[in-house]
A protein has these predicted regions:
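Alpha-helical/coil-rich non-catalytic "connector" segments in signaling and regulatory proteins
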Residues: 1-144
């Protein structure tokens, strides 16, 4: 299992700034997903508990109020954290920061790295961890 605090072992975290949700670093990450068009149409059915959500907030470029709506919906689903590439918004609205702090969901801001590098780094770790757990269970069954 990988929790948000464990991201410190990844090089890309040097480019992350924790903007909110300091008390939620123990949340477990089960997958990495991108928030894109869902913020426009409000359909978050493809998101799940434990998702680490990465976005550049393009969907809210002309409607910043969509940020709060999207974050609120995703937090209610139980996502583990958000990472926002600061292309369109250099900072988040104060009500979004307050929501993340209140619900203890970490929100990171970043700029100088590719979204793909973050996704691949976390996904590779999750896969290798999953494989390790599988082989550990298999070995335990042989030894039992």
């Amino acid at each position: 299992m990988l929790d948000v605090a464990s991201l410190e072992k990844f090089d890309f975290l040097n480019n992350f700034v924790l903007a909110a949700g300091h008390n939620g670093l123990s949340r477990t990450i089960s997958n990495v997903v991108i928030l894109d068009h869902e913020g426009i149409d409000g359909d978050f059915s493809d998101f799940h508990e434990g998702d680490f959500v990465i976005t550049n907030l393009l969907f809210a470029k002309n409607s910043p109020q969509k940020i709060y709506f999207s974050f609120e919906a995703l937090i209610s689903i139980g996502v583990s954290a958000f990472a926002v590439k600061t292309v369109f918004f250099k900072e988040l609205p104060s009500e979004v920061i307050e929501l993340a702090d209140k619900k203890e969901v970490p929100v990171f801001l970043f700029n100088d790295i590719y979204i793909e590098d973050v996704i691949l780094g976390i996904t590779d770790h999750l896969r290798s961890s999953s494989n390790y757990n599988y082989y550990e269970t298999l070995l335990d069954s042989f030894l039992a």
